[in-house]
Amino acid sequence: MEYFVEDILHHRGKHQRTHIEFLVKWLNYPPDKNTWEPYSSLRDVVKLHDYLRHNNMANLINKQHR
């Protein structure tokens, strides 16, 4: 089964890729199915990039595999 991100709602943790999680609203699922996901699971998701830019965290986008 494939899941699609509808929105990124919030984040928690330090502003470092290894210590940050994002609260994900999944497409076609109710809010009680929202989950906290690590950056590593979402790093290629466009919605995450939009969220990071909007929250002045865009520096995390291009730090992959450094």
What are these regions (language model features)?
Residues 1-66:
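Long, charged, low-complexity intrinsically disordered regions
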